[in-house]
């Protein structure tokens, strides 16, 4: 049986935002902010007619549009986080889902989104891409 090739493309973007964590005891229950770094990983088995998985620029633009919704905002006030904590985990999930909607039907898929709230702390969401 022939092995299937797997290609992976990754882009990084950033945004700045404030938040606080509800139902949490510790420093993060108070209003504070981060300069977030977001890593988006896209995977696919097939290159297009240009022999690329997708154009980096197209992925960067799609990610930019999503993080623009979060940039310089108080995340708790956004509809996506009204009933859900704007934790690193939930921010990664939000960005993953928005990008997955954007690229639905393509020959590749969003594999993961990682939200870094500091150089040493991050959370990754894989959605349905694992298994």
Regions found by a protein language model. Give the residues of each.
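Charge-rich, low-complexity N-terminal segments
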Residues: 1-131
């Amino acid at each position: 049986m022939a092995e299937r090739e797997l290609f992976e493309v990754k882009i990084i973007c950033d945004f700045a935002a404030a938040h606080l964590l509800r139902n949490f005891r510790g420093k993060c229950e108070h209003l504070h902010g981060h300069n977030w770094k977001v890593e988006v990983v896209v995977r696919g088995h097939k290159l297009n007619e240009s022999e690329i998985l997708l154009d980096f620029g197209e992925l960067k633009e799609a990610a930019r549009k999503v993080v623009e919704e979060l940039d310089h905002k108080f995340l708790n006030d956004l509809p996506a986080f009204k009933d859900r904590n704007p934790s690193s985990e939930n921010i990664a999930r939000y960005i993953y889902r928005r990008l997955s909607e954007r690229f639905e039907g393509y020959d590749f898929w969003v594999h993961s989104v990682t939200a870094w709230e500091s150089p040493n702390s991050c959370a990754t969401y894989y959605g349905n891409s694992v298994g």
